[in-house]
Amino acid sequence: MLTLKKIIRNTARFGHERFDLAGHQVRTSSFKFGPVKKERLVRALCKTWSEKTEAGWVRSKYATSIDFIDPKSHVRVSCSCPDFCFRFEYALHQQGAANIHFSNGESPGVRNPSLIAGCCKHVIKLADLLVSQGKTDRNFNLL
């Protein structure tokens, strides 16, 4: 199990451009935050999208979520974007920080051969939104 802070730190190993992109090019809508009684966790959920990428305009919206699964701030993260699916989902699943929802469950041999448990820019944007909305502190612990 991993904390959100640890996952975001691991993401920095892929380069700082993810943090810059999350701040400037990722947009959010339909933000929801609250307990999920059947699963005994607190979930943050929103739709995210990138307004522009290197290849041009992208209009796809992605379902992005962060589940706080215990009082020690361990999380499960998820995003339906291709970067998360084919780079991070398997590695996070190996650490207990994600379920296999969107990928095929195979190891990302080319995109993430070291199996670094990081996240996409959409998850980083949702984490920033949690801090700005006062739901978590700067270390991503629930308030």
What is the meaning of each model-derived region?
Residues M1-L143:
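Long, low-complexity, compositionally biased intrinsically disordered regions
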